[in-house]
């Protein structure tokens, strides 16, 4: 069940890890700084291994907490949405997850 997790901080710094199993909820919450929310229309991401179907998570209360804008994550979100216009921005750190079918199902 191999998978990949990419963490993108608000300064654009990326940390990519290969995972043997889906991360635990508590780990994801710690990474985004609170309760997680699925980012709508962010379902694919370009990776060195090609375009990948993905799940992207952010802090569900990030805007109310005045978390800083995440320009890189917002740019990737707009690319993922294709022709669907995104009239919003992502704030705070985000987590991108993708992998084989069993990894994705475990999320």
Q: What role is predicted for each listed range?
A:
Residues 1-107:
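Domain-length accessory/inserted modules outside core catalytic folds
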């Amino acid at each position: 069940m191999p998978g990949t997790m990419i963490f993108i901080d608000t300064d654009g710094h990326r940390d990519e890890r290969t995972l043997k199993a889906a991360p635990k909820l508590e780990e994801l919450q710690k990474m985004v700084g609170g309760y997680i929310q699925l980012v709508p229309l962010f379902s694919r991401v370009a990776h060195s291994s090609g375009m990948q179907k993905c799940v992207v998570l952010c802090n569900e209360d990030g805007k109310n907490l005045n978390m800083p804008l995440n320009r890189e994550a917002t740019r990737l979100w707009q690319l993922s949405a294709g022709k669907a216009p995104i009239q919003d921005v992502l704030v705070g750190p985000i987590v991108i997850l993708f992998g084989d079918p069993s990894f994705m199902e475990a999320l």
